[in-house]
Amino acid sequence: MSNQVLLDKLDRTTETLSNTLIHLAKLSDIEFGGKDTEQPRSSSGLATVSSSGVQMSNNYTMQLIKGIQDLLVITRSIREKWVLSQLPENEELSMFESEETLENCRKLVQESMETLLNDMP
């Protein structure tokens, strides 16, 4: 997947999670008799609200879990793409760099040895 596709999917999933959390908050306000409900409810009305509230809570909770799982998959894909983009594309280039580093180390060792040998009485 391209980066743009992953970012679009991330935006959609985040929006879905946000909406689901809003629905759960509204549902909990309805279930517990929000601030603007001044009328006492009958027992049959409470049972209806409770059973439908449980179903809706379950549905929204499942949506949250699915959304979080999607976010984990998306972020993992983004991290993997980022890590893979950090690796050198050409093995010859990395071999050349390692040979150059090795040559620099050899020069440093040689210079150090000469300095040590020259300083000895």
From Swiss-Prot:
Gene3D superfamilies: Mediator of RNA polymerase II transcription subunit 22 (6.10.280.160)
Protein name as it appears in the record: Mediator of RNA polymerase II transcription subunit 22
BP GO terms, sorted: regulation of transcription by RNA polymerase II
Organism listed in the record: Kluyveromyces lactis (strain ATCC 8585 / CBS 2359 / DSM 70799 / NBRC 1267 / NRRL Y-1140 / WM37)
Molecular function terms, GO-annotated: transcription coregulator activity
Family of this protein: Belongs to the Mediator complex subunit 22 family.
Localization of this protein: Nucleus
Keyword terms, alphabetized: Activator, Nucleus, Transcription, Transcription regulation
Signal peptide stretch: none
GO CC terms: mediator complex
Subunit-level organization: Component of the Mediator complex.
Database matches in InterPro entries: Med22, Med22_Saccharomyce
Described purpose of this protein according to its UniProt entry: Component of the Mediator complex, a coactivator involved in the regulated transcription of nearly all RNA polymerase II-dependent genes. Mediator functions as a bridge to convey information from gene-specific regulatory proteins to the basal RNA polymerase II transcription machinery. Mediator is recruited to promoters by direct interactions with regulatory proteins and serves as a scaffold for the assembly of a functional preinitiation complex with RNA polymerase II and the general transcription factors.
Entry annotated with the keyword Nucleus: yes
Domain of life: Eukaryota
